[in-house]
Every structure is written in structure tokens, then in C-alpha cells.
Amino acid sequence: QEPATLTTATGIIHGTFDLPSGTEPFPVALIIAGSGPTDRDGNSAMLAGKNNSLKLLAQSLATANIASLRFDKRGIGASAAAGPKEADLRFENYVDDAAAWVEQLRHDKRFSTVTIIGHSEGALIGAIATARTHPNAFISVAGVGRPAGFVLREQLNGKLPAQLFQANEKILR
């Protein structure tokens, strides 16, 4: 493992490279976490315990001679200082971050090709970043197969107070 950083206008985003033991250049995968306060290892501050799903994925890729980069989203973990105030955070920030990581990986001579792997919301972020940066490949892991507004309504129904749910509905229209 090796630390990685991405400098943004709001601060530094921190990540981890998992590198194979072999001869460079390696293919590299950018792993993008799903929604919520999810760290580079795939753990959410909203859930008890740790599953380390993204860390395990990165380790498995390394055994297959594929390097990977996973990172704490802005506002989370070691990237907490890079997060704007909650009111100023936009989905596009995450897309911009993913696109910047792809460009950084593309110019790193240790890597031969760049693939984006996005989980859940990370798949949507990855798809948009793919359209912008044209990596060699894109993999969606449990990405939404229905319109995002429909999925958000399902996820938030019964979890928000009625007034807040109605305000959310206006945004989703």
C-alpha cells in the first residue's frame, strides 16, 4: 500500500494505492465508494462495524496484478478537511474529484490503462466521469438501473419527516 493525494480547491483528498508485486506498468482501477459517509475501505459511519468491502476488492485486484486507488470522499475520513459545508456540497464535486483522479492516474507512468469501478452511487459518479475523461473501461457494481429520482424516493420514504420529504420531492421533480 502507498498513500495518494489529490489537491482540490477546497483541500486535499486522501487515498490509498494497492500495488501488485510485479513489473510495471500495471493496469489501474479507480474505486469509487457509494453514497453516504463511506470511507476508502467501504465502511460507512452510519453503520455499525466494518466490512472493508472496497479494501478487500483492492487487495483481490492486486493479487490479479491490477493496481487500484481508493479514496476517502471529501468530508470523510482523512479527506474531512476537503469537504465544503454540507449546504455547499454538490454531486458534481464528486464527479470532478473522480475525473481529476482519472487524469492523475493517466499521467502516472506506473500504469498502462485506467478503469473506473463505481459502487452504488459511485457507479453514477463513475459513469459521468467516464463520459468526461474516457478511461479504458468502466465497471458498475450495484449501480442503479432505474431513474435516480425514483430510487431516492424509495430510500427516503418513511425516513424523513413529512415536511422534509415534501421539500425533497420538489427537488426531485
Label every PLM stretch briefly.
Residues 123-133:
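Short glycine-enriched nucleophile-adjacent loop
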Residues 108-120:
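Alpha/beta-hydrolase fold nucleophile elbow
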Residues 53, 86-107:
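Alpha/beta-hydrolase active-site loop
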Residues 52-80:
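Conserved alpha/beta-hydrolase
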Residues 1-24, 28:
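N-terminal cap/lid segment of alpha/beta-hydrolase-fold proteins
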Residues 141-173:
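Accessory cap/linker subdomain of secreted extracellular hydrolases
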Residues 22-61:
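Short, surface-exposed "cap/lid" segments of acyl-processing enzymes
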Residues 115, 137-139:
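Residue in the alpha/beta-hydrolase core beta-strand immediately N-terminal to the catalytic nucleophile
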